[in-house]
Amino acid sequence: MHLSTVSQILALFTAVASSAPTSHAAVRARHVSPPEADLLHVVKRGDDTDFSDWQRYSLWNKRVEALSRNPELVSRYGYKCNSCGKGRMDENGMRRHIMFDHYSKDIPLEKSAHVNKYIEFRNKGG
């Protein structure tokens, strides 16, 4: 590589870096918080092949916890209860919510066996 090529590449990187917004608000507006972004990346892309079974299980639980606290991600990748509107990231979590929060309250016993009727699946994401 010639010196002029290296200086051109450095100039390009400098121009790109200086054009990017530097405020923290702009960064937060574009990205979800780092732990949630990392977990979402691993699970969505299936990049967990380097993990042991226990690490994979632990990662899955952390993902469900982290994403369940983020309403925007629940609405994109999760399940929404048609009865009360609460969201859960996984189907089993939604089934538990319905059985424990709505059982004998506002969903009659005979209908609680047909939980799928009360779950709206949302999959707008990748």
From Swiss-Prot:
Domain of life: Eukaryota
ZnF start-end (C2H2-type): 79-102
PROSITE patterns: ZINC_FINGER_C2H2_2
GO molecular function per UniProt: zinc ion binding
Induction pattern: Expressed during multiple stages of host plant infection, including the prepenetration, early biotrophy, late biotrophy, transition and necrotrophy.
Position of the signal peptide: 1-19
Keywords: Host nucleus, Metal-binding, Secreted, Signal, Transcription, Transcription regulation, Virulence, Zinc, Zinc-finger
GO CC annotations on file: extracellular region; host cell nucleus
Subcellular location: Secreted; Host nucleus
Main location, first listed in the record: secreted
Keyword Metal-binding set for record: yes
Function description: Probable secreted effector that translocates into the nuclei of host cells to reprogram the expression of targeted genes by binding on effector binding elements in rice.
Protein's name according to its UniProt entry: Host transcription reprogramming factor 3
Source species: Pyricularia oryzae (strain 70-15 / ATCC MYA-4617 / FGSC 8958) (Rice blast fungus)
Lineage: Eukaryota, Fungi, Dikarya, Ascomycota, Pezizomycotina
